[in-house]
């Protein structure tokens, strides 16, 4: 009981009692609440210190003066009041004393305001009322703003930062109300534009951006910035983009782009132009740097990394060099210089990867027996492990008779010969000599493999001679009687020109898509190749051809083919990253009656929203996964529909860290309660969420799924483990995969997949990455994501494609393979060795001062490898980097102001 009585006493001391007293006074003598409060305050006056008591009396006297009839006293009284409020120094957490003492008189003063005639005194009173209004936090009373609008003073900043923030908050609330009621908002906008410079002055750029964003006037921002504030404002704006909806996200990027251009930050502007996927803007930015050849080369590297086909007039040697940068021709050379520096040029054998001696001795012999299937797996492992180095011990050997091709059979020969393409990746000039001899052999599978190899080695690289066009865009090969050669040629073209939007290829490929006589396998491959070449361009000719095929009554039976999913994927890729623009196609697909229509629509939608982290889309996809499928003729289509929805959840969430965390939890639920078709897709989606980023929580879960009772779930989990660790040499994953090799030593298909995963894990001897995000994880590469998606769509039914005869589909992943290196060059593109610090990137958005952008760093000399989430910065100021992010190929310029060690 004692406790309760104590509690009531403390409650009495505080607010509760004031309210009670107010009622009492009103009842007894009908006084106004303000007077009631005054008496209450007097009762409590014993608690005030002498100074406070004096201040309180002074302020009360000033209020009295305002109520008197002598108008000459008003001005000095108001000035004294303002002075008192402005000079009060109280702690930031408490309400300033003058406001505390004036609050009881607030109602009195508002009445006075209503009674006074218009004039300076009235404005001055409104000024004071606006400040006292801060002490009321009712939702419906925006008094601070109300009186601020009535008082035309310009000197808002003198009331302090807290007041300005409070005002901004109320502007936002009132603006939303006025928009809802269709009332004019111009005065609010004008006031907001007065507050923005005040925010920027006190380093609260986040508040400035938020206020302008809320009032939809973000385009006005650039005129308020200067050299000191623009970088922080842009950093905040760009990091907000992922959380905004269309079209605000695009507006923000465009405004930030214009700010960077204004302050000559060309590389940062270019990164945003690339994110906007606006070719006109990219060309304009590129042309703007024509005075500075070194800068143009740096911009060319950025454009080339994204695989954007940019044409420009070449008139001199400098232009030729810039074109080399723009078309990635030197990529192979720089990659090999990295290999030399890291001392890994020596080719690795499959045994170096399998490490059979570490597998349990009982089954060690059995996982390594010599069969065509095992040799095919070895071919893939060799292809991935030595990718890009141009040397190995199985394919590029002295005598043709020793070549590994002869140890495989049928389609296996095609995939093995195609592995030459990955070994010689990006090295077109030398590569063609090695592959050429295989095109003359009589075995058609080997010819097919050679054509595919030509396509693979040209991926992400362009040359003037266009060997892929010359060798593959050949009617004889595209109409060859053997469908394998047709498929290989089409796939080769799709890889070689991925993302290039090359119009000349339409005449070769579009007819194949819509030809009703053609087998579904070839048509679908042509659709996928077109999707790759025109990724994200919403090319109408290709989309019409694919939709016509879907609408065609006669091709109904063809659409039941397992290959028809690639027809759908081809359509989806055309709208990659297009967001709202995909709705046109979704409407068209509603007219298609075939069960393939729904899965196609979902594929198109997930491609359009890839990497955006759009929460509403993820919710829609989760709803699709919840539906129960009835048995019937539409069952296959519905099952694919749910599998694509699961992949889509991963694809959309991959761009944003918080979304990833949440989605990984959803995947756990889907694995518990989902049907078999959903469970098969979950491991693939988990791999897609963090490719080349082996997070322990993800691979531990996948390791559990890799022993699942459903063999297809296990196979997909094994592949996902490979994808998760692709190119990282992660020791824990390597150990898990070796254990799986022993566990599945009797199961040929699972063992084949374990080998593929081991090859992926050690890709490029640990120097490559398949993560589609680059340039400090800001930009999502369309081409890379499209390649990953093609492999994963095939993996949904692994036993019909990858582990049976269509294993060559794995080579679509080549579009995503890229060195995770930092190579520094001088202005003549010669490698330059400098010291850099490499550490974990730290998010510094909105932090005060100039915080460190990396943590836990080590100093290394370039060229260096960068892991996922790592960032590099130059150790000293001897050189200035022309690129805003140290990643990939970076040009350094000597700093003219550097003193150095003289």
Swiss-Prot record:
GO:BP terms for this protein? proteasome-mediated ubiquitin-dependent protein catabolic process; regulation of protein catabolic process
Organism taxonomic ancestry:
Eukaryota, Fungi, Dikarya, Ascomycota, Pezizomycotina
Q: What does this protein do?
A: Acts as a regulatory subunit of the 26 proteasome which is involved in the ATP-dependent degradation of ubiquitinated proteins.
UniProt entry keywords in alphabetical sequence? Proteasome, Repeat
Tree of life domain:
Eukaryota
Please list the GO terms describing molecular function.
enzyme regulator activity; protein-macromolecule adaptor activity
Q: Where is the composition biased (Basic and acidic residues)?
A: 1-41
> Which stretches are PC repeats?
415-448, 449-487, 488-522, 525-559, 568-601, 645-680, 681-715, 716-750
Composition bias (Acidic residues) maps to 42-52
Q: Where is this region: Disordered?
A: 1-54
Q: Which GO terms describe its cellular component?
A: ascospore-type prospore nucleus; nuclear periphery; nucleus; proteasome regulatory particle, base subcomplex; proteasome storage granule
Gene3D superfamilies the UniProt entry points to: Leucine-rich Repeat Variant (1.25.10.10)
Instruction: Spell out the InterPro entries in the cross-references.
Output: 26S_Psome_Rpn1, ARM-like, ARM-type_fold, Proteasome/cyclosome_rpt, RPN1_C, RPN1_N
List the Pfam families. Answer: PC_rep (PF01851), RPN1_C (PF18051), RPN1_RPN2_N (PF17781)
Q: Which family does it belong to?
A: Belongs to the proteasome subunit S2 family.
Q: Which organism is it from?
A: Neurospora crassa (strain ATCC 24698 / 74-OR23-1A / CBS 708.71 / DSM 1257 / FGSC 987)
Under what name is this protein listed? 26S proteasome regulatory subunit rpn-1
Q: Give the gene that encodes this protein.
A: rpn-1
